[in-house]
Amino acid sequence: MRRPQAGRIALSLFLAGQATPLTAAPAANAQRAASCTELSTATPDWLIWNAMSSDWPGSGGGRVQLFANHIPTGELSSCNVNYRMNATDGRIIGHDPTAAHACINFSGTTALNTSVQLDMDTLLLTVRSSWICEGDETARYAAAGSANLQRDTSPGACIVEGTLYGDSITCPIADVEVEGELLGVS
C-alpha cells in the first residue's frame, strides 16, 4: 500500500477548502471570458465569499473577515474589519461605520486597490476599488458598491470555542455579489 505524501495531503486539503468559491464559479467564469476593459465599464462587481464573523467578548474584540473577488480583473483581496466589544455584555462599542479598511490584494498582474466599510449595526458592506487592466495601462477605473451581509446564527451554524477570556464565537456569513457602480475612468 502506498503511503500518502505530506505535500499531496496538504494540496488535497487546500483544494477541499475551496468549495465555497466554486459555488459562484459558473457566473464568474462566464464573466471572465469578457475582457477586463469591457467588464470594468459594464459590471465592475465583486463576489464576496468565505466570510465569517468572530467575536471574543471576554477579550474585548472581534472581526469580520471576507474575501472579495473583483470580477473585471479576476483578482482576489482579503479584507478584515476589526471592532471593539464590551467585555461585560458583548456589545460592539466605538465602531465607526464610515471607517475604510484596506484589503490585502493577492495581486497577479493588475494594479488593484480595494477597501471596505462595514456598518456593524446593519451589516451593510461597501466595497471600493480602483484598478488598471493588464495591457491598457492608460486607464485607471474606480467603482463602489454595497450589499447587506447575512450572518448565520442558526443553531449549529456557529463554532463556540473556550478561551482564557471566555467563549469565542465564529459564525459564517453567506456569499453575496456586490453590484458595483463605475465612479470614473482617468
Set out the residue ranges of the language-model regions:
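Fungal secretory targeting signals
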Residues: 1-32
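Mature, structured extracellular domains of secreted fungal proteins
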Residues: 22-186
